[in-house]
């Protein structure tokens, strides 16, 4: 997704949220969740103070958390450092838990997938920035997918964040199209071996869906419902969808 087409996004889920099991990260009641994406790290980010004024219990970043667009992990780390230096982000991080997945521009480059040559280094930079311990099992996964459970027993919410980059098969590009959207006119990939999440992530995802939960929120960095645009979407991998 491109920064020119998407302004910083803030969405709130404000309802009575109840969810899931004994693998709870925090037993404090969660009743309001904020979501964001598409953050240009080089400018002012007043959005963070707007988020805090809404008083969410939890904040979830859904990708393009910085626009690094680089295969160089040093440059990627520098882009994250600019985000980390934002005063509003620092205040928000102290006020509530922050969960995240990535999209293409914080993964490496526009519309990149499994072919990204430095994806493992990008993953470690991502995990470093979001404070994942060096001995965490997440460091060994094939991607940044992650799930957490919040809230007391009987009133728990599970957040599942998918990684639609690390294992994604090549996109199918229709060369003769001139009405380009998000950098290309992509077609469905009907190859039975093509994947969006990869086998390990699918197995993990199935396990997460078995976690007892009254409310389960699944985050994807690319569009789930869209059928018609030429950009990136789950419909590009119909067998996975």
Give the predicted meaning of each segment:
Residues 1-5:
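Positively charged n-region of N-terminal signal peptides that target proteins for export
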Residues 7-16:
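Bacterial N-terminal signal peptides
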Residues 21-241:
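Metal-dependent phosphoester/phosphodiester hydrolase catalytic core
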């Amino acid at each position: 997704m491109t920064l020119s087409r998407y302004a910083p996004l803030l969405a709130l889920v404000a309802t009575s949220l109840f969810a899931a099991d004994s693998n709870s990260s925090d037993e404090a009641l969660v009743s309001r969740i904020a979501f964001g994406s598409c953050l240009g790290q080089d400018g002012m980010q007043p959005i963070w103070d707007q988020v805090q004024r809404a008083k969410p219990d939890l904040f979830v970043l859904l990708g393009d958390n910085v626009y690094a667009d680089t295969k160089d992990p040093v440059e990627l780390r520098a882009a994250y450092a600019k985000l980390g230096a934002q005063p509003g982000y620092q205040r928000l991080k102290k006020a509530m838990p922050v969960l995240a997945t990535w999209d293409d521009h914080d993964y490496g480059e526009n519309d990149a997938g499994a072919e990204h040559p430095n994806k493992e280094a990008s993953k470690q930079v991502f995990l470093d920035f979001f404070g994942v311990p060096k001995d965490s099992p997440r460091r060994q996964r094939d991607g940044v997918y992650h799930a957490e459970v919040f809230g007391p027993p009987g009133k728990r919410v599970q957040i599942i964040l998918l990684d639609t980059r690390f294992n994604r098969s090549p996109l199918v590009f229709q060369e003769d199209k001139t009405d380009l959207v998000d950098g290309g006119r992509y077609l469905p990939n009907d190859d039975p071996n093509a994947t969006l999440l990869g086998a390990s992530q699918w197995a993990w995802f199935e396990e997460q869906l078995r976690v007892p939960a009254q409310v389960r929120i699944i985050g994807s960095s690319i569009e789930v419902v869209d059928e018609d645009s030429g950009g990136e979407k789950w419909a590009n991998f119909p067998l996975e969808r």
